[in-house]
Amino acid sequence: MGSFDEVSHDTGYEDYITFLKRRIRQLELQVRTLEADKERLERELSRLRTEMSRLRQPPAFAGTVIEVLDDDRAIVQNYNGPRFVVRIAPWIERDKLKPGSRVALDQRTMAIVELLPTEKDPSVLGFEVIEKPRVTYQDIGGLERQLAELREAVELPLKHPELFEKVGIEPPKGVLLYGPPGCGKTLMAKAVANHVNATFIRVVGSELVRKFIGEGARLVHELFEMAKEKAPTIIFIDEIDAIGAKRMDETTGGEREVNRTLMQLLAEMDGFDPRGNVKVIAATNRPDILDPALLRPGRFDRLIEVPLPDFRGRLEILKVHTRKMNLRNVDLSIIADITEGASGADLKAIATEAGMFAIRDRRTYVTQEDFLKAVDKVLGAEKRLAQAIAMHEVMYG
């Protein structure tokens, strides 16, 4: 009996020891967890104290560097204020401090304490296209030669500049796309932007025309400055005839401001390095009214005509716009043959209208008859509109 009590007593003692060891491990784990939480909270407290300290700092003045002196000093000018000779803080990188740089000045000592980014008009920042266009070269039909010339002038210098170095020639600075409306000029620029890993800046010529003197020219200058900072860059100026029309001797105040904007554009295109990673593409429907200075070599070196598509081009465009459509017994060559004089935009509208006719008839496929009715609706409406305009001009002059 005694031996049994001793065994029971020993077993209970061992179980109690095991329980205590397990409890110790649990407490040690809790301690490590609490220590980790403490370190995290201390880091958060330190960050918040630093943030509070920064928020309590007095505001700094913004100024412009006029001249950098040798002995860690510089001449700066506060906006619309006097000039000061001030100290340069030791953490400022001297090689980045140049005349014209925007800097932050300490409120008490006026010392330069920070380099500020270049000032830009908010509208210039809005010109940048953040998301790449989804248009590819396969989405453009009937313009193989024009696309090849555009890629040689824009894509090749950006991707393989060493080829031009080896041959010993300068790549084109700019490309002008001209031709009737709806023939794919903007589409070509989008396709290039999609295939080149570059910043794409799109601006319409009329957006550069401003009310007050010098604003348009300043906008053009800031546009090219942003392009250099974000290089490689493609600048696409649509409807360039809004600022690039021929200059006349007799001009009004508004026309003079447009001329100033044009002259700034000419100066910017002359100024940047042709082997630099900034390329300019422009598009217009009216090449006949453009200023000759804009078209001379060294500015827009390559002029690419984008004409109305011929039979083969119309057939290729129709294939592009119908490749996702459910067609039944449709001969696209017949549609291409009867749409002579139609632009790429007209052909896209015809494909869309043919699909609409099928939807009206509660069908999930498109037939030849749908396309014939669409041709009559799209091109017939254009002819009727042209006749109405001609009759109006005859009646009212």
From Swiss-Prot:
Official protein name in the record: Proteasome-activating nucleotidase
Family: Belongs to the AAA ATPase family.
Binding site for ATP: G182, C183, G184, K185, T186, L187, H321
HAMAP family (alphabetical): PAN (MF_00553)
Gene: pan
Main localization of the protein described in the UniProt heading: cytoplasm
CDD domains xrefs: RecA-like_PAN_like
GO MF, any single term: ATP binding
Job description of the protein: ATPase which is responsible for recognizing, binding, unfolding and translocation of substrate proteins into the archaeal 20S proteasome core particle. Is essential for opening the gate of the 20S proteasome via an interaction with its C-terminus, thereby allowing substrate entry and access to the site of proteolysis. Thus, the C-termini of the proteasomal ATPase function like a 'key in a lock' to induce gate opening and therefore regulate proteolysis.
Lipoprotein recorded as keyword: no
Keyword Translocase carried by entry: no
Domain statement: Consists of three main regions, an N-terminal coiled-coil domain that may assist in substrate recognition, an interdomain involved in PAN hexamerization, and a C-terminal ATPase domain of the AAA type.
UniProt KW keywords: ATP-binding, Chaperone, Coiled coil, Cytoplasm, Nucleotide-binding, Proteasome
Subunit text: Homohexamer. The hexameric complex has a two-ring architecture resembling a top hat that caps the 20S proteasome core at one or both ends. Upon ATP-binding, the C-terminus of PAN interacts with the alpha-rings of the proteasome core by binding to the intersubunit pockets.
Gene3D superfamilies (alphabetical): 1.10.8.60, Nucleic acid-binding proteins, P-loop containing nucleotide triphosphate hydrolases
